[in-house]
From Swiss-Prot:
Tissue and organ distribution: Expressed by the venom gland.
Domain remarks in the Swiss-Prot or TrEMBL record: The presence of a 'disulfide through disulfide knot' structurally defines this protein as a knottin.
Propeptide feature ranges: 20-50
Sorted UniProt keywords: Disulfide bond, Ion channel impairing toxin, Knottin, Secreted, Signal, Toxin
Protein name, per record: U7-theraphotoxin-Hhn1a 5
SUPFAM superfamilies: omega toxin-like
Disulfide bridges in this chain: 51-65, 58-70, 64-81
Role according to the record: Ion channel inhibitor.
Signal peptide limits: 1-19
Lineage of origin: Eukaryota, Metazoa, Ecdysozoa, Arthropoda, Chelicerata
Length: 90
């Protein structure tokens, strides 16, 4: 009886140590993937951004293309790029 209880307690201790190791490995992997995502976002922010096309959402940091202008249009609750009644030069 004592041997069976000792075996069960020993098995539980081994499982606790193994699960702690797996959890630590999973946490490290999660932190690593988060760092990679942040690096990718930072790299994309430094690149030149394209202009916003017709009916695209626009702000000061998201300009419209040359032949469009950023305007507020009701009932849409944000600014959109609309045609400024000019044609782009070829």
């Amino acid at each position: 009886m004592k041997t069976a209880i000792f075996t069960v307690v020993l098995a539980l201790a081994v499982f606790a140590v193994l699960s702690f190791g797996w959890e630590a490995n999973e946490k490290a992997l999660s932190e690593e993937s988060t760092e990679l995502i942040h690096e990718k976002e930072a790299a994309s922010e430094t690149e030149a951004r394209e202009c916003r096309y017709f009916w695209g959402e626009c702000h000061d940091h998201m300009p419209c293309c040359d032949w469009l202008v950023c305007r507020y249009k009701w009932p849409i609750t944000y600014n959109i790029c609309v045609w400024n009644r000019t044609f782009p030069e070829k």
